[in-house]
């Protein structure tokens, strides 16, 4: 049995490739679970989160773990990034395949004005 799962191997491969290409730009990190999707813009040099958005909204049961919710999170993170003065980021899919909810979030963030 392998010491690392396929997901962990993919996550490490993606993260090392990002470090090589980032060029000091903040990264847009995506995490998805069965119920929610989360996005953060992180400045790795300072170790700070510059902006964050997720489907965790109190009282709103309509938003969940579907493609539409991911698109809303992508638009929200792009809006918060603009407010913080961030225009270019490096997309960190975090080992998740670029398909479905992750792709919807990325497309909405691009439409909102983020470049990656």
Curated annotation (Swiss-Prot):
One of its GO terms (molecular function) is structural constituent of ribosome. GO terms for biological process: translation. Coiled coil: none annotated. InterPro entries: Ribosomal_uL18_bac-type, Ribosomal_uL18_bac/euk. Belongs to the universal ribosomal protein uL18 family. This is one of the proteins that bind and probably mediate the attachment of the 5S RNA into the large ribosomal subunit, where it forms part of the central protuberance. This is Large ribosomal subunit protein uL18. It comes from Novosphingobium aromaticivorans (strain ATCC 700278 / DSM 12444 / CCUG 56034 / CIP 105152 / NBRC 16084 / F199). The lineage of its organism: Bacteria, Pseudomonadati, Pseudomonadota, Alphaproteobacteria, Sphingomonadales.
């Amino acid at each position: 049995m392998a010491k690392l799962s396929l997901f962990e191997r993919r996550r490490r491969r993606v993260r090392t490739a990002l470090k090589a290409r980032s060029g000091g730009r903040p990264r847009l990190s995506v995490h998805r679970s069965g119920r929610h999707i989360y996005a953060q813009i992180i400045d790795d040099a300072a170790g700070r989160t510059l902006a964050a958005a997720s489907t965790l909204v109190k009282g709103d049961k309509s938003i969940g773990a579907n493609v539409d919710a991911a698109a809303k999170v992508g638009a929200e993170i792009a809006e918060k990034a603009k407010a913080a003065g961030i225009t270019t980021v490096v997309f960190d899919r975090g080992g998740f395949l670029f398909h479905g909810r992750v792709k919807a979030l990325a497309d909405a963030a691009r439409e909102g004005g983020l470049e990656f």
